């Protein structure tokens, strides 16, 4: 009697691309080299100044697991491009969904390791630390795996989206928000933060793995990625000072409170709606619940006290 081989898990990888010719080959090869998975790679190419889309059309002849969405529209940001993918992707017949950038290198066991973690721990999302690397040979582990806090999902992502693996259930919940005309989801600038927040708002669990799963390329077009170097830190400080971060938190709070009304989140939303001494003092009480990193909690407290946040 013949023994049937167990089916490999089916993973749909969503890749957003823009002017990606320089590094996209390496990224796709690292996805093709994933072990013990059956992969479909769905790519949305934003209107580009190079020939990324036409190059990928030719590459499909070699990598038959590649599928391309229609080309020609301008989405203007990685988040909008990912939102298009989430809305248009056919999620049927897939066991897991992953996000991919166009310029990184995945560790060969990235997907299967995270699949096993999801199955062992009963979570709907897994992300991980990443190993940032530069053209000059510099490398640095970006640590995002500090213990999760009660409300960290209102203030930050679970790490870089390129490390995310999710269930179809979660992707459908994100899609519901993106297609709901009353939701602010499409206004969120970071798709990974939105995804993590929606998962946690539904009361579902997420795991952040300490083992890096992605070599996270740093170059002039994504200097913000690892938040490494004074230029990136200065840009983030300016965003904080000009109110960008607070506005994103306000939108995330609104979305999450709409998913599952919560008295504490509602009170936080009311505090964020005003800027006075009383609201500052009250906001400080949320700091210990807000960010995973001790340094980030200290910086958030300082920014609240100084009126920058």
Please describe what each predicted stretch is.
Residues 72-91:
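Glycine-rich, basic loop-to-helix element that forms the pyrophosphate-binding segment
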Residues 184-197:
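Acidic donor-binding loop at a coil-to-helix junction in glycosyltransferase catalytic cores
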Residues 20-33:
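Short, well-formed alpha-helical segments that are part of the catalytic scaffolds
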Residues 94-103:
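Short beta-strand-to-loop acidic/aromatic patch adjacent to the donor-nucleotide binding site
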